[in-house]
Design a protein with these regions (language model features):
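Non-catalytic pre-domain segments flanking phosphatase-related domains
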Residues: 7-12, 18-29
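Asp-based phosphoryl-transfer active-site loop
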Residues: 22-40, 135
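Short hydrophobic segments within beta-strands
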Residues: 30, 69-71, 125
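Short catalytic/ligand-binding loop motif for oxyanion handling, primarily in non-cytosolic enzymes
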Residues: 36-38, 75-79, 108-111, 131-134, ...
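Short, acidic loop-to-helix structural element flanking the phosphoryl-transfer center
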Residues: 37-68
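Substrate-recognition/cap helix-loop segment adjacent to the acidic, metal-dependent catalytic center
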Residues: 58-67, 72-102
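Conserved Lys-Pro-Asp/Glu-containing loop-to-beta segment of HAD-superfamily phosphomonoesterases
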Residues: 98-130, 135
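Acidic, Mg2+-coordinating phosphoryl-transfer loop and its flanking beta/alpha structural elements
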Residues: 120-157
Length: 160
């Protein structure tokens, strides 16, 4: 039995039943280093390197209605948002919702979702171990992206 099954069993024993548990949590996905190459716009650059690298990953996760969660950096914030939004619109179908934070560790504010007075951990796929540590310290489930196969295996283990 895995942790999620244990949680479900305990909830059932306590009379806490969520019809569709996975509708109560969200999947967030980083852009740079996960779906596109590092682009530099979040460091104040022009974002010239916009190669899309995440087609296999995206095709496998889009059924979970992921939300793109990306840092803009403190320089050229509006330009970074514009470039990243265009990348999402150009490469990801169906086009997902996009959320921005200024710095990567700030992503932690999205780590949990409250539904019917219950708090559920959200999942973040990110290539930054620092971002994942911050996410997990705020109650979320973090998956450090190294390659598509390992990320998908980890994700499936949480969503079984």
């Amino acid at each position: 039995m895995n942790l999620q099954e244990d949680i479900q069993r305990i909830r059932q024993m306590m009379g806490i039943i969520v019809e569709n548990y996975y509708d109560s949590k969200k999947l967030y996905v980083d852009m740079g280093g996960v779906l596109v190459k590092k682009m530099g716009a979040d460091e104040g650059g022009s974002g010239g390197d916009t190669d899309y690298i995440g087609s296999e990953l995206w095709e496998s996760i889009k059924k979970y209605n992921p939300i793109i969660l990306s840092a803009t950096g403190s320089k050229n914030i509006e330009n970074s948002k514009k470039i990243k939004t265009k990348q999402v619109q150009d490469h990801l179908k169906p086009t997902p919702k996009v959320e921005f934070v200024v710095f990567g560790p700030d992503k932690k504010i999205f780590a949990t979702t409250t539904h019917d007075d219950l708090v559920y951990p959200n999942i973040l796929i990110d290539d930054s171990e620092t971002n994942i540590k911050e996410w997990e310290s705020n109650g979320g489930i973090g998956l450090v992206h190294k390659n598509n196969q390992s990320t998908l295996e980890q994700l499936e283990s949480y969503l079984k």
